[in-house]
């Protein structure tokens, strides 16, 4: 799941080149950490025109010196227009946007920058219709930009560690507003007939991992935890049966929600991941209304 599509999550990208080059949130990392813009007015005042945006992106992309984005050669020549480059070795032309999320787009960098700001600072996310209105493009174009930005915000593959909370939730599947003869039977509880189950893990004071899964059976839940949580970490969950064997692999503490227990002595709880779900669902119901399983992940 591409979480920042729905939440204001600060992504601290520490690698500025190589694999991070096509990630537009390299830029967001820089403005959050270095310039720390507090408002959209401050942001647009700083990035006031296309020339400023281009110079800023060049500074980031060519941090360690100019190079050809096709072959990596360090001898390149700039055209008189200041926007295009040609490699002295492979003779290929390119712009500062080539092989980035901005590539193949005729939209100005300034438009992309503002879109990224809006998407990353909206707590509950922003719909493509609203984004289109705010940056002056069509809904189709805003959707295209939104999807590119979301894909660039893929989750870190590193494992969580320390104190990790686990929980599962379901997205979609509301049948109450349908006519009785169009309702799918057997959708209550943990049924996945019309709902998408999502497994979530959050490191206390750290990152989140959330993935759409086929079910929340014991084997599936255990596999998700092993994939994303470092062995030796302390795992906190509720009393859902699928977590009952995980104590063989991790120090495991349980909060018995079924008995009205939500916090145990020693700050043992799963409130962090549950708060995450609450924020997610406010964005889902209030902004997106419906989401296919494909776009949920």
Outline where the language-model segments fall:
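Residue-level recognition of single "structural anchor" positions
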Residues: 6, 10-297
């Amino acid at each position: 799941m591409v979480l920042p599509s729905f939440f204001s999550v600060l992504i601290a990208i520490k690698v500025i080149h190589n694999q991070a080059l096509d990630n537009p949130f390299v830029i967001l990392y820089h403005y959050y950490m270095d310039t720390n813009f507090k408002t959209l007015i401050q942001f647009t005042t700083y990035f006031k025109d296309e020339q400023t945006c281009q110079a800023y992106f060049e500074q980031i992309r060519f941090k360690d010196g100019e190079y050809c984005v096709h072959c990596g050669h360090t001898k390149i020549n700039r055209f008189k227009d200041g926007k295009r480059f040609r490699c002295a070795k492979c003779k290929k032309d390119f712009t500062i946007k080539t092989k980035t999320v901005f590539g193949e787009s005729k939209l100005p960098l300034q438009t992309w920058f503002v879109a990224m700001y809006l998407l990353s600072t909206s707590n509950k996310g922003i719909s493509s219709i609203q984004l289109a209105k705010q940056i002056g493009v069509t809904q189709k174009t805003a959707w295209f930009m939104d999807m590119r930005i979301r894909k660039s915000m893929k989750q870190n593959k590193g494992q969580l560690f320390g104190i990790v909370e686990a929980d599962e939730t379901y997205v979609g599947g509301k049948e109450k507003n349908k006519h009785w003869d169009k309702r799918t039977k057997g959708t209550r509880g943990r049924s996945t007939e019309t709902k998408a189950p999502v497994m979530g893990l959050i490191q206390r004071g750290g990152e989140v991992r959330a993935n759409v899964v086929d079910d929340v059976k014991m084997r599936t839940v255990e596999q998700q935890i092993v994939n994303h949580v470092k062995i030796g970490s302390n795992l906190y969950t509720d009393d859902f049966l699928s977590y009952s064997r995980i104590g063989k692999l991790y120090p495991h503490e349980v909060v018995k929600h079924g008995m009205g227990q939500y916090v145990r002595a020693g700050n043992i709880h799963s409130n962090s991941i549950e708060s995450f779900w609450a924020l997610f669902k406010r964005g889902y119901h209030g902004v997106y209304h419906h989401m296919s399983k494909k776009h949920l992940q």
